[in-house]
Amino acid sequence: MPSDYAEIRNRVEHYFDRTATRAWARLTTADEKVSKVRQTVREGRDTMRAVMLSRLPDDLTGCRVMDAGCGTGLTTVELARRGADVVAVDISPQLIDIAKDRLPPELRGKVSFHVGDMADPALGQFDYVVAMDSLIYYRAPDIGRVLTELGKRTHSAIVFTVAPKTAFLMAFWWLGKLFPRSNRSPVMIPHALDKLQRHAGDSLIKIDRVARGFYISECLEYRP
């Protein structure tokens, strides 16, 4: 991947592995109290997870599925419960450790955890790839390249999310450009579907959009 991709990936790793680990762990713990704003994000992510999983068969027995950017492992658990052999990948070692600790004992034989880049060819072939909010910080050309490369190793579909190009999210993006802070989250980049299609092709389609308070995300599907 080009240097822009690597630079953003390293920034994402630094943020989630050093600055935001505890906050992310709380956000992804259902009975943990969070602020009203973060509660809307939690609810939005729960809804989006259900949308994404609806694109995969209920029975994934015999399927090899990558949870790309698995975080604390919520999607990983659901995929394993459907019978998939899950490759759970995240750039953050600390989040991987949390995901390992939270994995139910009866599912441990169904999941292998990996710290690193979801685009690493060494991860092998997959039937499906799920990438929830893992590509939201990257530019359209980089997303196109990731999809193209992953598509060569994916038999059925890549289901992923982006930040849609809305007035609300564009305002946040401009604020992030104007007032950068070294200790804050990397700035997500809103995308229009037609621009992404110019880099990934017409096999990229929109599935659904979830908007819940401060969480706004769009589910897309790429079929190689």
From Swiss-Prot:
Keywords: Bacteriochlorophyll biosynthesis, Chlorophyll biosynthesis, Methyltransferase, Photosynthesis, S-adenosyl-L-methionine, Transferase. Signal peptide: none annotated. InterPro entries: Mg_prot_MeTrfase (IPR010251), Mg_prot_MeTrfase_C (IPR010940), SAM-dependent_MTases_sf (IPR029063), Small_mtfrase_dom (IPR007848). GO terms for biological process: bacteriochlorophyll biosynthetic process; light-independent bacteriochlorophyll biosynthetic process; methylation; photosynthesis. It catalyses: Mg-protoporphyrin IX + S-adenosyl-L-methionine = Mg-protoporphyrin IX 13-monomethyl ester + S-adenosyl-L-homocysteine. Pathway: Porphyrin-containing compound metabolism; bacteriochlorophyll biosynthesis (light-independent). The keyword Ribonucleoprotein does not apply. It comes from the Bacteria. Gene3D superfamilies: Vaccinia Virus protein VP39 (3.40.50.150). It is an enzyme of class 2 (transferase). Its EC number is 2.1.1.11. GO terms for molecular function: magnesium protoporphyrin IX methyltransferase activity. NCBIfam families: BchM-ChlM (TIGR02021). Belongs to the class I-like SAM-binding methyltransferase superfamily. Magnesium protoporphyrin O-methyltransferase family. Converts Mg-protoporphyrin IX to Mg-protoporphyrin IX methylester using S-adenosyl-L-methionine as a cofactor. This is Magnesium-protoporphyrin O-methyltransferase. The gene is bchM.
